[in-house]
Amino acid sequence: MDVILLDKIGKLGNLGDQVAVKAGYGRNYLVPYGLAVPATKENVAAFEAQRAELEAQAAERKAEAEARAAQLSEIELSLVAKAGDEGKLFGSIGPRDLADALTQAGLDVVKSEVRMPEGPIRKTGEYDITLQLHAEVTSSVRIVVVAE
């Protein structure tokens, strides 16, 4: 199935690229979420007519993400959690907990933007957490976990 991408998608392509994807991926994910349209003659012509407008919107979203990244990179957040004698937490701190804590600190962060490749935090200490704000924009936030 050939589709025209309406946004930059990692490991697939950029805005306006015409790519071949498996039918299920296109039909069940890309098209319903507004990330692509089927590459018919009508859609190709309509996309070329709207290309400048879509590129301007994409550039605006990227600029907003870069502004958020600059704001977030200056933040050091302290979280208090119950922990044992050796610093091991009772429970863990995951992406949802971090997103909620950043939102309470006045920053607009959703759970899906938090990247924790090592898994949830299970010990007290300092951690650098990566936030994927846009396909091309990432930011790092320092999190300090202290025992209650």
Curated annotation (Swiss-Prot):
InterPro entries: Ribosomal_bL9, Ribosomal_bL9/RNase_H1_N, Ribosomal_bL9_bac/chp, Ribosomal_bL9_C, Ribosomal_bL9_C_sf, Ribosomal_bL9_N, Ribosomal_bL9_N_sf
Cytoplasm recorded as keyword: no
UniProt keyword annotations, A-Z: Ribonucleoprotein, Ribosomal protein, RNA-binding, rRNA-binding
Coiled-coil segments: none
Keyword Transmembrane appears in the UniProt entry: no
PROSITE patterns: RIBOSOMAL_L9 (PS00651)
Molecular function terms, GO-annotated: rRNA binding; structural constituent of ribosome
GO cellular component: ribonucleoprotein complex; ribosome
Origin: domain of life: Bacteria
Any one of the GO BP annotations: translation
PANTHER family given in the database record: 50S RIBOSOMAL PROTEIN L9
Function: Binds to the 23S rRNA.
Family: Belongs to the bacterial ribosomal protein bL9 family.
Protein name in UniProt: Large ribosomal subunit protein bL9
Source organism of this protein record: Chromohalobacter salexigens (strain ATCC BAA-138 / DSM 3043 / CIP 106854 / NCIMB 13768 / 1H11)
